[in-house]
Amino acid sequence: MPDYRSKTSTHGRNMAGARALWRATGMKDEDFKKPIIAIANSFTQFVPGHVHLKDLGQLVAREIEKHGGVAKEFNTIAVDDGIAMGHDGMLYSLPSREIIADSVEYMVNAHCADAIVCISNCDKITPGMLMAALRLNIPVVFVSGGPMEAGKTKLANHGLDLVDAMVVAADDSCSDEKVAEYERSACPTCGSCSGMFTANSMNCLTEALGLSLPGNGSTLATHADREQLFLRAGRLVVELCQRYYGEGDESVLPRNVASFKAFENAMTLDIAMGGSTNTILHLLAAAQEAELAFDLRDIDRLSRKVPQLCKVAPNIQKYHMEDVHRAGGIFSILGELARGGLLHTDVPTVHSPSMADAIAQWDITQTRDEKVHTFFKAGPAGIPTQVAFSQSTRWDTLDDDRENGCIRSVEHAYSQEGGLAVLYGNIALDGCVVKTAGVDESIHVFEGTAKIFESQDSAVKGILADEVKAGDIVIIRYEGPKGGPGMQEMLYPTSYLKSKGLGKVCALLTDGRFSGGTSGLSIGHASPEAAAGGAIGLVKDGDKVLIDIPNRSINLLVSDEELAVRRAEQDKKGWKPVQPRARKVSTALKAYALLATSADKGAVRDKAMLDG
């Protein structure tokens, strides 16, 4: 019998009590010779990306047990950022990532599980489970709930998503009837919101990290093909257990799959597909858990050489995740990157000996396997539903046009510089992040006048009250991991700037973060944050700020001497907002803030404080 971790709680006379309890869960004599595989589910009726997951854990469990494992399912929490947005609920979103990671670690270690299947989907759940998997370093397979179908309405000639509903709601020229129509049409099915927002970005990145199956990030939640991903995950995790525990093959462990090279691959993909800036935060956090020295400097280096090969909503209205899938999904983007010499193809995945082998099998422009071609023809049915695997619609053709299609070749890239950039300067000494895919080229270099707000709420009020003018740089500070606390998303301020016609004539800088739905010159993750003594806390109304994306710089046009004077004054006052905010900060949030690092460290806990 292999030397399973679970033997700690299943073997030996002194474990009679534990075995009695295992038996009470349904285990038989023969089960104590099998690997115990945890299924970390995240079903909840609060979140459309998770509302359909209730029965999927047991679907995986049956497949695990059919192939020789013992499956034990548990649940963790899931916060819907869209529902939590615009009020104090957003303070809990990023901290929930740490709770999710902890809860998975607690359950798996407390019960000595041998492996995990992580059933995630939305914004903080995939990152939280990824952090846990890399902490635990036992065999794992990720399988997410899948993306939502894009919405449709006669009032628009393009697919709709959540951001469209938010933008029209903030546009005074839109009638109540139009707003209501968009609201009812934007989110028609279960699944993670239909554009390249944070949830879908992260689920795509698990493919590049090598920890999930091909199609995980792009196969629609409603499509029957997605069921096969769950079944394959159940079979695969048993195989990984056999390889590790039975054969001593450590190459299957998460830290050996998600190596430094794999993190570079994931970030390269993120840049190429114009993913959410939140993915940077989460990859940095995951790298910390894997004990990898992967940081913003590495991301900056990659951002300078990786072109943008895919453009999806919110960066363009024409394409949503269903279109990415039709174009071959993530492995077609990885294939183009590989042909451009931009990908490490020698790294393993949980399903293939190497990324090169996986690309050869799954890239629609390389493979001749008709089953693969059929798989990527899976499309939307256009029928509102909250039921997984409820339709089997297929496109007649694939989108394999690498010159003008959804996915482009390196030679025909949307732009030769990728969709994300890291900026440094005296206002963000440790860096800040911008999603260049959503920035109009006319404002890649922008000098503006600082307009200071010390909370997201006050910024929203100011924008809606027309206090922000063309040429302003809206600065929202004390919204970082420690200062918020919780590093709120700033989707409402950016959406309202857009609805006011200021999207191409203003910028926004914050130590908070942005939704994957953000577009415009929106710069987040300013590090160090204001609450940690960052220079963003020294900016005054009327100061000039120069943003230079091509040169990767952002600077407050104030002398070093003046900044030193301001810093001394701020040290005396304390690094906190001038006016108290009407914000209830619970004990749980205060505990999070106490240990939170700035965004350049992934906003993870400060281990130095824990180690004393």
From Swiss-Prot:
User: Which Enzyme Commission number(s) are on file for it?
Assistant: 4.2.1.9
Q: Which residues form the active site?
A: S515
PANTHER family assigned: D-XYLONATE DEHYDRATASE, D-XYLONATE DEHYDRATASE YAGF-RELATED
**What does the subunit comment say?**
Homodimer.
Q: Which UniProt keywords apply?
A: 2Fe-2S, Amino-acid biosynthesis, Branched-chain amino acid biosynthesis, Iron, Iron-sulfur, Lyase, Magnesium, Metal-binding
**Matches recorded under NCBIfam families:** ilvD, PRK12448.1
Could you cite one Gene Ontology molecular function of this protein? magnesium ion binding
Q: What is this protein called?
A: Dihydroxy-acid dehydratase
Modified-residue entries (N6-carboxylysine), positions: K124
Q: Which reaction does it catalyse?
A: (2R)-2,3-dihydroxy-3-methylbutanoate = 3-methyl-2-oxobutanoate + H2O; (2R,3R)-2,3-dihydroxy-3-methylpentanoate = (S)-3-methyl-2-oxopentanoate + H2O
Tell me its family: Belongs to the IlvD/Edd family.
Which positions does UniProt annotate for Mg(2+) binding? D81, D123, K124, E489
Q: Does the keyword Magnesium apply?
A: yes
Q: Which organism is it from?
A: Ectopseudomonas mendocina (strain ymp) (Pseudomonas mendocina)
The pathway is: Amino-acid biosynthesis; L-isoleucine biosynthesis; L-isoleucine from 2-oxobutanoate: step 3/4; Amino-acid biosynthesis; L-valine biosynthesis; L-valine from pyruvate: step 3/4
Q: Which InterPro entries match?
A: Dihydro-acid_dehy_C, DihydroxyA_deHydtase, DiOHA_6PGluconate_deHydtase_CS, ILV_EDD_C, ILV_EDD_N, IlvD/EDD_N
